[in-house]
C-alpha cells in the first residue's frame, strides 16, 4: 500500500520563527505571527490528510461481497456470463492448437463474424433460464456488460476481433476476499475483462480486493508459430513432451486452469497457461495458499474443470479419458475419486470449442446440491448415488460456445471459511 508521509511543523519551526521575530523587531512581528499561524494551519491540514490516508488502509468490512475459498461451500452470489454478440475468433495459431481439426473450416470461414444467430438465440434463452433457477435457489446473480465483440482492435503487436463475455470462469478467480483478473492467452480475448469491470468496481468499492495479473503483450514470441498439429496423436505426443503452443516469453494464464480446495489450489500447464503464469500466481498467493501443478493424459489441455472437478471436501470427479498423473496425492490424503459416466451428448451436436465432457463441468450450490445438464441422465444418477440432489437445467446450445455450468459462472461469494483439506 502506498503511504503518504506527513510533514508537521514541530517545535524547531516555532523556535525559528520566534528568533526571526526578535531579531527583526516589531516591524515584522505581524508577519511572523501570520507565518506561524499559516504553519499551524498547514500542520492541521497535513494531519487531516493522514487521517484520510489511514482510512484508505482500514481492514476489509466483515460483510465483504467477495468471499470464496473452494468449489462447494453454500453459494450466495455468482456471476453468470452472456452469449449475446459472441463472435467466432480469428483462426490464429493459438486457436488452432485448442480446437479440433473437424472444426477448422468453420473458423476459417466465420472467424471475426458472429456465431450462428439461431444458435446464439437458443443459448441466450438457456442461460436466462439458468439464471432464473439460480435465483429461485436463493443465489444472487450478476451479469457482465453486453459488448459488441465483432469490433476490430489493434495493439502494437497484433490485431484481432473479440470472442465473448460468456465464460467468467476463464477470466476471473476468487481467492478469499480477492478477485483476480487473469491475463488470458488468446488474442481474441485480450479485452474480455471490459465486460466485467462494472461488477468488479462495485465489489472493490464495497470492500473486496481487486488484482489484475500482468497483461501479456501477446506478441508473436508468446506463441510457437510452427507448432505442429495434424492429428490427436500429434497432440498426445506434444503434450507428453511438455510442448504447448504458448511459450514462456511472458506470463499468461486462464483462471479456468485453476481449481480451489481451501489452502490448496491445483493448476495445469496447458495451451493457455504457462509456467510463468503459474509462478506469478504461486508468488502472489503465498504464503496463505499453496499452488500445486497437476497434469493429465490430455491431447488438448485447456481448462481443468472438464478434466478434474473438485465437488466437495475430499471428493473429486476425475475424467476417465484424461487420467491424472498425480492422483496418488489425493488418494494418500484420503480423498474419494469418482469416475463420471460417459456423456451422452449426440455426435452431431456442434461443440466448436470443447468436448462432450462438459457433462462433468457442473456447479455445486453446496455439498448436497449440484446444477447439472437436464439431458445427462447418467451423471444425474451418479450424483444421486453420492447423496447429492440434482438441479436440472438444459444448456446444450450454450455448451457449443465452450462451457458447462462451471465455465459459465464465477462464484463470487460462498458461505465458508479458509481450511486445509490436505494437512
From Swiss-Prot:
Q: Which GO terms describe its biological process?
A: creatine biosynthetic process; learning or memory; muscle atrophy; positive regulation of cold-induced thermogenesis
Concerning InterPro entries, the annotation shows: AmidinoTrfase (IPR033195)
UniProt GO molecular function: amidinotransferase activity; glycine amidinotransferase activity
Give, as in the UniProt entry, the pathway in which the protein acts.
Amine and polyamine biosynthesis; creatine biosynthesis; creatine from L-arginine and glycine: step 1/2
- Enumerate the Gene3D superfamilies for this protein: L-arginine/glycine Amidinotransferase, Chain A
Chief subcellular site? mitochondrion
Q: Identify which top EC class this enzyme belongs to.
A: transferase
Keywords from UniProt, A to Z, are: Acetylation, Membrane, Mitochondrion, Mitochondrion inner membrane, Phosphoprotein, Transferase, Transit peptide
Residues with PTM N6-acetyllysine: 385
Catalytic residues (positions): 254, 303, 407 (amidino-cysteine intermediate)
A single Gene Ontology CC annotation of this entry is: mitochondrial intermembrane space
* Entry binding sites for arginine: 170, 305, 322, 354-355
Catalysed conversion reaction: L-arginine + glycine = guanidinoacetate + L-ornithine; 4-aminobutanoate + L-arginine = 4-guanidinobutanoate + L-ornithine; beta-alanine + L-arginine = 3-guanidinopropanoate + L-ornithine; taurine + L-arginine = taurocyamine + L-ornithine
Q: Where in the cell is it found?
A: Mitochondrion inner membrane
The similarity annotation says: Belongs to the amidinotransferase family.
**Complex formation:** Homodimer.
Function field: Transamidinase that catalyzes the transfer of the amidino group of L-arginine onto the amino moiety of acceptor metabolites such as glycine, beta-alanine, gamma-aminobutyric acid (GABA) and taurine yielding the corresponding guanidine derivatives. Catalyzes the rate-limiting step of creatine biosynthesis, namely the transfer of the amidino group from L-arginine to glycine to generate guanidinoacetate, which is then methylated by GAMT to form creatine. Provides creatine as a source for ATP generation in tissues with high energy demands, in particular skeletal muscle, heart and brain.
Identification of the protein by name? Glycine amidinotransferase, mitochondrial
What organism does this protein naturally occur in? Answer: Bos taurus (Bovine)
Gene encoding this chain?
GATM
Amino acid at each position: 500500500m502506498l503511504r503518504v508521509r506527513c510533514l508537521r511543523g514541530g517545535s524547531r519551526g516555532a523556535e525559528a520563527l520566534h528568533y526571526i521575530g526578535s531579531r527583526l523587531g516589531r516591524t515584522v512581528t505581524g508577519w511572523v505571527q501570520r507565518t506561524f499561524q499559516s504553519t499551524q494551519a498547514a500542520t492541521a491540514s497535513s494531519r487531516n490528510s493522514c487521517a484520510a490516508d489511514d482510512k484508505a488502509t482500514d481492514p476489509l468490512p466483515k460483510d465483504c461481497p467477495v468471499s470464496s475459498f473452494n468449489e462447494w461451500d453454500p453459494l450466495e452470489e455468482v456471476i453468470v456470463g452472456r452469449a449475446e454478440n459472441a463472435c467466432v475468433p480469428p483462426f490464429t495459431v493459438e486457436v488452432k492448437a485448442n480446437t479440433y481439426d473437424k472444426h477448422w473450416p468453420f473458423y476459417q470461414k466465420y472467424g471475426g463474424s458472429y456465431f450462428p444467430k439461431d444458435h446464439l438465440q437458443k443459448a441466450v434463452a438457456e442461460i436466462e433460464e439458468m439464471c432464473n433457477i439460480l435465483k429461485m435457489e436463493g443465489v444472487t446473480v450478476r451479469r457482465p456488460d453486453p459488448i459488441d465483440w465483432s469490433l476490430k482492435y489493434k495493439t502494437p503487436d497484433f490485431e484481432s476481433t473479440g470472442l465473448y463475455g460468456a465464460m467468467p470462469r476463464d477470466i476471473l478467480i476468487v481467492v478469499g476476499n480477492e478477485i483476480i483478473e487473469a491475463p488470458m492467452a488468446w488474442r481474441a480475448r485480450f479485452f474480455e475483462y471490459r465486460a466485467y469491470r462494472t461488477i468488479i468496481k462495485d465489489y472493490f468499492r464495497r470492500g473486496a480486493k481487486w488484482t489484475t495479473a500482468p497483461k501479456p503483450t501477446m506478441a508473436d514470441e508468446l506463441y510457437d508459430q510452427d507448432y505442429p498439429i495434424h492429428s490427436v496423436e500429434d497432440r498426445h505426443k506434444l503434450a507428453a513432451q511438455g510442448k504447448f503452443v504458448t511459450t514462456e516469453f511472458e506470463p499468461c494464464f486462464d483462471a479456468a486452469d485453476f481449481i480451489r480446495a481451501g489452502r490448496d489450489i491445483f493448476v495445469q500447464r496447458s495451451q493457455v497457461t504457462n509456467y510463468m503464469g503459474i509462478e506469478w500466481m504461486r508468488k502472489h498467493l503465498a504464503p496463505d495458499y499453496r499452488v500445486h501443478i497437476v497434469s493429465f493424459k490430455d491431447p488438448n489441455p485447456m481448462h481443468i474443470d472438464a478434466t478434474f472437478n473438485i465437488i466437495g471436501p475430499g471428493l473429486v470427479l476425475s475424467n476417465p479419458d484424461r487420467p491424472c498423473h498425480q492422483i496418488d496425492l489425493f488418494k494418500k490424503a484420503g480423498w474419494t475419486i469418482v469416475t463420471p459416466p460417459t456423456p451422452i451428448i449426440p455426435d452431431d451436436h456442434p461443440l466448436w470449442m470443447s468436448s462432450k465432457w462438459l457433462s462433468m463441468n457442473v456447479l455445486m450450490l453446496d455439498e448436497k446440491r449440484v446444477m447439472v445438464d437436464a439431458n445427462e441422465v447418467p451423471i444425474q444418477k451418479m450424483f444421486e448415488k453420492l447423496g447429492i440432489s440434482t438441479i436440472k437445467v438444459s444448456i446444450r446450445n450454450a455448451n457449443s460456445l465452450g462451457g458447462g455450468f462451471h465455465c459459465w459462472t464465477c462464484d463470487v461469494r460462498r458461505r465458508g471459511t479458509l481450511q486445509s483439506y490436505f494437512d
